[in-house]
Amino acid sequence: MKKFIKYLIRLYNDIQAKLTSHPISHLPLSKVDIQPIIMIPGSSATENRFNKMVRKLNNGQHPHHSLIRIKVWNDGHMTYRGHLKRKDRSPIFVVGFQNNRDGYKNIKKQAAMFNAAITVLREKYSFNSFKALGHSNGGLIYTVFLQQYLSNHSRLKMEKLLTIGSPYNLNKKEISDRVPMLDDFVTNQEKLPQQLQHLSILGIFFRDGDGIVHRSSVEAGRLIYKGKIASYREAIIAGKDAHHSSLPQNDQAIDLIREFLF
């Protein structure tokens, strides 16, 4: 009977964590030092974007990784949903934005909002190292963060960055037709942390891309990262499950994420 009651309490807490948002100041404490995995979704997506992917990542893993979903609102305040296991050394934080629109101007705003979020997380958990994942424009937000904000954080190190279908040259199909954002990324590549390891996942769903992002736009990441960081490599996923929106929960992608980040 006691076990059943405890189960009901856990179930209730899980449901409440999923349904109820809390002020960021109410984030629970951790009993251990953490090295979080922090994820950023792409444009139009919310902090719930990676729910299915995280369920797949946790499948067969013991213990499961905590999932905390943070939303940064346009007025600067932040809320969160989810539950932190207090002895989880590698919890997953997803940071989404009220302003989740596309375009370089918005990407720069989102990078500033992410910088505010990671400042709050470090004040709460005092970590000096983290691993990162960005889907689509999430990878672009991370690139802006690395070049413009990371050095402002004392002793903070991004150990690994995994990007999925990130369009470093936006919607262009020819690498010779470079957008201003890509030019800025290349100009500022010396600001990238030299110890960083980067894995870029590219989807081939139809001809030369994942149905949304052209192959050459993802491969433009070479111009930014290759030779400037500790390691840069690319992985190609092809087939009917390699569409841009399907890539984060693609089984091959899940294997690559586990291998690289966990």
What is each residue range found by the language model?
Residues 7-133, 140-262:
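Lipid deacylating catalytic domains
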